Amino acid sequence: SGSVIVQGGVITNTGLIPASASVGSTTAFSSTTAAYSSSTFDSSNNKIVVAYADNNGYGTGVVGTVSGNTVSYGTPVVFSTNFSYYTSIVYDSANNRVVIAYQDAGNSNYGTAIVGTVSGTSISFGTAVVFNAAYTQSIGIGFDSNANKVVIAYRDVGTSYGTAIVGTVSGTSISFGTEVVYQSSNSEYNAVTFDSSNNKIVVAYTCAATNGTASVGTVSGTSISFGTAVAFNPTRSSNYLSGAFDSNSNKVVLYYSDSPTAAIGGMCVVGTVSGTSISFGTAVAVGTSTSSSFTALSFDSSVNKIMMAYRGYFSGTYLGRLAVGTVSGTSITVADAITFNAANSYYISLAFDSNANKSVLSYSS
């Protein structure tokens, strides 16, 4: 295999209805192979932070600064010299820290988390903490800004159950409560979204029992409880799940590859939280590719649009694609997708910079 350059591009919404998008210049944030990239916005420092596994498999973080339609990056900082898979990052706005959850392959594949502190264009890390002393996969992470807690959802490989745990950041460390099972079936592609209107955590996932499914969680202290799971795509697997909260319409939006009949650029669906349950509108197709994978979402609050990126397949070629959606009631309208990278694009993530009013798209190519 050759070296893969990981690049970040700034996506600028034009505000058209239905919304389309324009793409700024591309900047490398790593000069080596990278995988499992995940990104977030640090609003206290007005920085984008990307977490990923570098060419050695080392867990790495890098800080980006948006200026106009470009993004520049500081020097990458290693947070783990073990192979670090399933990296997922979130910003803790109560403590002004980022938290990265990952599978530590050098420590029996345990689920592990670490706290990062941004300073200027660099980032420093505390000591890693194990949150699941068992083989851990398919990690998603979110932040509950009402309870001021981090929530990590993951597949515990020993049981294959979908499991969640609440984390409390203190300084440069994090401690955890007791894990809670939200799905007693094989749970994959766990995506965590916080609904700030209802102060609920929504975990979306695909499982053998009910395929595309979501569970609503309520954080109390250092624990979380879940309502009854609701299927949003009950007949087929919903892979490469991602989620975002539209704070204008107060809706959760999910984006996924509709397997095994993914003859389109994936599907998106609008969810409405009520109490400890969630209901869904009708799923809408995204793009026109013959398959989709590596989906990513962000909400652009400056124009109230959902940005959605994915890897699409067209006549033997993989392309990086981008579309924009507008939520209305329980439905979403999606504009025609554009190409942001005319080459194979994977490990895609999106983060909205509310200072610059731009969504930063990170990907491998």
Predicted region positions:
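Extracellular, repeat-based ectodomains that mediate carbohydrate processing or recognition
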Residues: 13-365
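Intrinsic low-complexity, repeat-rich intrinsically disordered segments enriched
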Residues: 1-18
